[in-house]
Amino acid sequence: AEVFPERNSYDPKNPGWAWMSNNSIAAEVGTNYEDYVDLIADNGEPGFIWLDVARKYGRLADAPDNKDYRVMGFNPCAEQPLESYELCTLVEVHLNRHDDREDFLRTLKFAYLYGKTVTLMPTHWQITNGIMQRNRRIGTSLTGIASFADTKGMPALRDWMDSGYNKIRGYDKKYSEWLCVRESIRVTTVKPSGSVSLLSGATPGVHWGPGGAFYLRAIRFGNTDPMLYLLKTAGYKVEADLVSANTSVVYFPVASEHLRSEKDVSLFEKIGLAATAQKYWSDNGVSVTLSFDKETEKKHVAPALHLYEGELKAVSFLPMGNQTFPQQPYSNITREEYNSYVGKIGKIDWSAIYDGVENLESLGEAYCSTDACEIKFY
């Protein structure tokens, strides 16, 4: 509460229960969204999930198939409708890393095969195994969608999405028979993809970039992560996390090449792009957080929800303003600050993770039969 006093719903007596903790309402088409606008404008919550749409439809471009009538909820980021005890199987393709559509379609083959292969692995829970074997649900995701639309146009985006989806469905029919397993109930998704998209310079998932030609991206690492040791040694700015005692925050300098930032795009265009992805690409869901100017766009929140409630399976919001927060994910910097920071960063010897660094150990979880596992890199 001392670190984030603006969290007006924080209750010291019940620290685990408050807004700002990824809350959503199970809504239905026709919900009175006006009742929630003030809460959304305050801190972005609640979000909305439409189970009726998720159970009835795959892609919104296709006729209702009712295949997902057993769906009981979503994963935390709401890109995957799931049955109780069902797991996510996600893989991602970066739109901005392809020369043409044929190159993109070829990438989808290998992404699909990876996702399908993971569904062949058993888990420790028999009830989960039964559901996974019946559904074979995978989520082949796209990232860089907003920047692709800005550079190549919406007609090209719709074409790539639609042809890509049909190509994956063709692969699934072919390889499911070859593997002697069921075809997947759903095969595509759009996950939020915040940190992963930085690796290829893509805009994250279906979102526009955070804004600014130059900015710092704050990413959290566990204090026992060997990466943290290497980043400190290389000269990256590292701070102790203000909330978690066992976590550190590393600031990465980024030079953006995106044509527009999220501040340049209206609420309606943002939700419209998410609906396009739900219509032409994703037969699971689309993870989207709609940033909006709470001074000028608050009045548009409820109309936008009424307009697109039958075209999305889930949505959340993030009010934007002039207020800044400690260790926020993105913070703008000047060109001079960027160049100064980059000039101080040394080269990282990534092989040190495997070849051995003095006192360098990593503790983490592994896929094993015990409650906790220790992983050491030599």
Task: Locate the predicted segments by residue.
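Inter-helical turn/loop segments and adjacent helix faces that build the functional surface
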Residues: 97-102, 123-128, 149-160
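Active-site-adjacent structural elements in folded domains
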Residues: 123-135, 182-183
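Conserved, charged catalytic cores of large soluble enzymes
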Residues: 1-69, 139-167
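Contiguous, well-ordered alpha-helical segments that form the cores/surfaces of helical PPI scaffolds
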Residues: 90-92, 139-151, 192-199
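Flexible, glycine/threonine-enriched loop-and-boundary segments that flank and lead into catalytic domains
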Residues: 167-195, 201-203, 355-362, 367
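Catalytic alpha/beta core of large soluble enzyme barrels
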Residues: 38-40, 47, 60-124, 134, ...
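Local cysteine-cluster metal-coordination motifs and their immediate loop/turn environment
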Residues: 369-376
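Short, well-ordered loop/turn elements at secondary-structure boundaries
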Residues: 13-14, 20, 30-36, 41-45, ...
